[in-house]
């Protein structure tokens, strides 16, 4: 026991050196502070009316894996501006292209991806369930209608989206655009919100408190306009495109639900437990909202590689984590990525499959936030 006082003194000295108290609360995973760039429109061009003849893809596949992405050069300033320029589609079928400028751009902002020639040309059965199916169907209106599950919505094209503002939904670009043209149904795109379905026509704000919901149904709101980055339109799933597989939808009216803010994706090692979470409308469980969580297996600057169980229909789901927000002294969930699709990757000569999420980087945060708020001064905190 004689060594215990000496050990205690050593611990105290270590705490003083690290400027913390030996009696402080356990460490909390904290949202990092970032010096964010600014992405601003510079010019807008009118384009010909859009075509809507692409077949909806509920998943995107790519064979360019982590090493392929990590080994490619950074884009030039002009290339980064090109990728972050964007196309806007309006409800009447008209569209515009907006070119952007980037300010306070650091060396690490964005990567252009090349194709891994050794990983192409393979045809394998896609497997999006890893061992035991770890997904959870969410039942009961007390869960479905409350945060965070209530932020998940269904797109009329078959994908999932997440409420990120009073009138805005974040989803995957491939849910509305195949990289060349718009998906069938995008011109009349709608977003579905789960609501209780009452018997005998009861329900809504004027229904009696004794009315019991029979089951859930979708209530739909039309989309006013969509934004898709040119990095997606000019690329494809085997090139840089997957890095830009995200889109923002603006609704015709507010949805009146609590939404989840977007945030810059921290490094995987800073995520609580190294895990991510997301909920979506997987096609193999029709009508059900399906929740899952899993560990991040690898990462690049733009992508998170994981093996969360998922099926087509979950694409576009917002990937989120819950961390401590120091200025407000509270826990907060934020969307840090968008679930995109599936990849077969050659890892040291053997095939490995992943599900992939697009990370919200500082540049992407600046772009998406500007789409939502329309004022870069409101986008200084990621």
UniProtKB/Swiss-Prot annotation:
InterPro entries: Glutamyl_endopeptidase, Peptidase_S1_PA, Peptidase_S1_PA_chymotrypsin, Trypsin_dom, TRYPSIN_HIS. GO terms for molecular function: serine-type endopeptidase activity. One of its GO terms (biological process) is proteolysis. It is found in: Secreted. Residues 1-22 form the signal peptide. Glycans are attached at residues 92, 206. Its EC number is 3.4.21.-. Keywords: Disulfide bond, Glycoprotein, Hydrolase, Protease, Secreted, Serine protease, Signal. Pfam families: Trypsin. One of its GO terms (cellular component) is extracellular space. Gene3D superfamilies: Trypsin-like serine proteases. Disulfide bonds join 159-175. Its main location: secreted. It is an enzyme of class 3 (hydrolase). The active site is at residues 174, 239, 315. Belongs to the peptidase S1 family. PANTHER family: SERINE PROTEASE, SERINE PROTEASE 23. This is Serine protease 23. The gene is Prss23.
